[in-house]
Amino acid sequence: MATTPYEHAINSTRAVLTGIGPDQLDAATPCASWKVSDLVNHVVGGQYMFHSALQDQPPSAAAPDFAAGDFVASFDEGAAQAVAAFQAEGVMDRIVRLPFGELPGSQLLYLAATDTFVHGWDLAKATGQPTDLAPELAAQLLDGARKAIHDSMRGPDGAAPFGPEQKAPEGAGNADQLAAFLGRTV
């Protein structure tokens, strides 16, 4: 199974992670309940969680503080493990158990790409990096999000997977439009 959108999301977010300095780890992010270090931990830990779920293994009981170490190297390792797990025979058709429910591997692949990419956008915004990330991938993920995300999945930060849709500014790039659709103020 091709994991190309997910791998593009990994590459885009990795570029953002390399631009984060230690002095930025306490900065606020578009995810109001998280600072940069929290979001780094989520993005890096998410890669390991995708891998564990695809291997039918429970997630780690105690999440490491990736932001306190070489989080780019940890991201690379977790992403490589997740990509390999997504490429296993039959995984796209298998039901995968996650901490928040069950879904087919093919849907988890889309979720992994979107989560990884959008949180890369969040980190770019929080650390003053450009947010017009991977325009073609962002357009593809936005199209999928418009089909998959419904109002019942939206609510206040921390209470629902996505915030209320925001209006993107006139002429906003695809990544900014995706972020706004998923509830970020652009």
Regions found by a protein language model. Name each.
Residues 1-15, 19-32, 49-186:
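Structured surface interface patches that mediate subunit assembly and partner/cofactor docking
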Residues 39:
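Extended, alpha-helix-rich binding/interface surfaces that flank or overlap catalytic cores
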